[in-house]
Amino acid sequence: VNAHVYYSLAEGRSGLAEQWLGRVFLNPPYGRQVIGDWIDKAFHEHKSGSADEIIICINNATDTKWFARLWDASLCFVQGRIPFWGAHGTVFVYLGENNEKFSEVFSEIGCVISRTDGDNRRIECKV
């Protein structure tokens, strides 16, 4: 991912402790004990206005407590598997105002459930 700033625990910088600015790509650690903290942080940074747009690459564990909050965002359920560790498929989550653009781009790789207006949703699959 082409980014201006990287946060990595290996480098001693936790993204949970930093303010996120502008456009953010998040691939959080998938441990059960911490993943909810990362989801909460993403929603907080977006709602505060610090992060304009956030894309989260995460496993599609729709049966988990932390995933329930993601239904408030636009989602792309990737068709097929991205070769990561683990048995789940992948979901890209979008927090931002460009839901139509997210749907246009990400429907090329999976089925997108995007917010339209209010509580309305649109489903688009090109694959």
Where do the language-model regions lie?
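Class I S-adenosyl-L-methionine-dependent methyltransferase catalytic core
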Residues: 1-127
